[in-house]
Amino acid sequence: MQQEMKIVKPNIKQGKRSTVSKYMETNRICLFNEVCCLCDTDIKAEIDEIIWQMTHGSQIVPLKIEDLQYLYEENVIEKRRFCSFADNKDERMESVVREMKKHEPVDKNSYEHVLILIQTSKDHPLMMSELQGLNDVIEGFSPKAEIRWGLGTNVDLWNRLFIMLVCSKK
């Protein structure tokens, strides 16, 4: 899986939080799921990381640090990352959306805030037609959920599409 940055995770004392991480690779999708149930204030470093990724990865349609401060007050944060490896069978957005639907949050309707970061390379920018695929994913969230999204570029992606989805609630 392509990583846009290297991050050193903080040492968190056992019993302070519950984290489930898994890595799954298919022939077209590279998927990294990370579900964090926040139980203590020791999780600040991980929230800092999410905010850094969201704000520094969204240069075209930016997400602002001050707009993401609510994450420090949330009790549950679920972070999922998807990177397409499009081939002739599927378009890159179709392949990511299919995997997002397979691995979507357990109860999408319960989340109050949703952040979506979309990245492509400058040579293979996001097309307006590709954004239509995200509508199916977004429709499953509560109508009351606040949804924010950012768009950026990453030179390492070439023809791939990267999406990071962060869902949270109190």
Regions found by a protein language model. Give the residues of each.
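Tubulin/FtsZ superfamily GTPase core signature
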Residues: 1-170
